[in-house]
Amino acid sequence: MNFTTEELEHLCFVTRVDLNGTKSTLEDTKHYIKVCKKRKEEQWLINEHTSFRDHLKIRVKKEQALLTKLENQFISQGGTFE
């Protein structure tokens, strides 16, 4: 797909915001798993959060790769981040 410089800049911004939110959720989930283990919560609850954590790790990698591609395309089209 071809995007204008303005569209790419906006896509980078939106993707960065989404990535930051996902990273924050990932850190919160990691912390919650530790708390659950200390409290000796039921194993199914820990397993559910562990599965969610693993999903978030994959999502962070995908979003980071997308952001890198968008930023590279933006820069190659002569865009600059302010």
Placement of each model-derived feature along the sequence:
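Amphipathic alpha-helical coiled-coil segments
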Residues: L19-L26, H49-G78
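Charged, low-complexity interaction regions
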Residues: T22-S24, V35-I46, G79-F81
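N-terminal acidic leader/helix
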Residues: M1-K34, I75-S76
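Glycine-centered signal
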Residues: F3, K34, K38, A65-L67
